[in-house]
Regions:
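Non-catalytic accessory segments of DNA primases and related replication-initiation nucleases
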Residues: 1-116, 120
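Short acidic-hydrophobic sequence patches enriched in Asp/Glu that either
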Residues: 5, 20, 179, 223, ...
């Protein structure tokens, strides 16, 4: 590859789209006009388990948002111009408080997921005393998807003036910050003849998307070579629109 790595076409698609071998195989088969539905594929058990866990968590966050505990969040999002279509399109949710997180963990355990599974995907972390702490609390939750549309991580925005304002999932087996872009699937839908817009934050992407603009975010201000390669796999032209603060400059 141009980046100096070695591999075949499957490795390339897996790297660029941050997807599993099975998903890369299906994507290439579709591109080549081969019907892959008549074949069965053995997925990596660890990856399959983590994707199922994150999907389940994302569904729980969405339920929280539309429950009584999410009323304040819904009002905030409505004030920001995020309507029900955008909520559904970007699968936006709410992590809730400690009690709702404890309830979620108990449900996940009943469904066969272990605490180690939750630590591995970045939902729970351990402090120096080995006590388990919920990574996301009382945050607007925006799932980060791979190019197959599967949840691989989350971005959480705090309500009010707390710090940090945005909190991304830690790096995991599924999620590599130096490769992942936010909003790729929606940007491709809106691309047509419009130029791709690269911005900093989730809310920027969601706002631009609501007006029909193809936008993605780099999950921070630092663009890596992997990000740039992924960007030009989406579009030949792109505008860089970062914030006007010191970090954005």
């Amino acid at each position: 590859f141009g980046c100096g790595k070695n591999g075949d076409i499957f490795n390339y698609v897996m790297e660029m789209d941050n997807i599993s071998f099975v998903d890369a195989l299906k994507k290439l088969a579709q591109y080549a006009g081969i019907n892959h539905n008549s074949y069965t594929f053995a997925e990596d058990p660890k990856q399959k388990n983590q994707l199922q866990l994150l999907k389940r968590v994302s569904e729980s966050y969405i339920k929280n948002l539309h429950a009584p505990i999410g009323e304040k969040v819904r009002n905030y999002l409505k004030h920001r111009g995020i309507d029900n279509f955008l909520l559904e399109n970007f699968k936006i949710g709410y992590s809730g408080n400690i009690k709702s997180n404890e309830f979620l963990v108990s449900c996940l355990k009943k469904e066969g997921f272990s605490m180690n599974d939750m630590i591995d995907v970045g939902l729970v972390k351990q402090n120096p005393q080995k006590k388990n702490i919920f990574y996301f609390q009382q945050r607007i939750m925006i799932p980060i998807l791979n190019n197959s549309g599967k949840v691989i991580a989350f971005g959480g925005r705090i309500l009010g003036d707390g710090s940090p304002k945005y909190l991304n999932s830690p790096e995991t087996f599924l999620f590599k910050k130096n490769k992942q872009l936010f909003g790729v699937l929606n940007a491709k839908k809106n691309l047509n003849k419009k130029r791709l817009i690269i911005c900093e934050g989730y809310m920027d992407v969601i706002s631009l998307s609501s007006h029909g603009y193809p936008a993605i975010a780099s999950l921070g201000t630092a663009l890596t070579d992997n990000h740039i390669e992924n960007i030009f796999n989406i579009s030949d032209e792109a505008f860089l629109v970062f914030d006007g603060d010191a970090a954005g400059k």
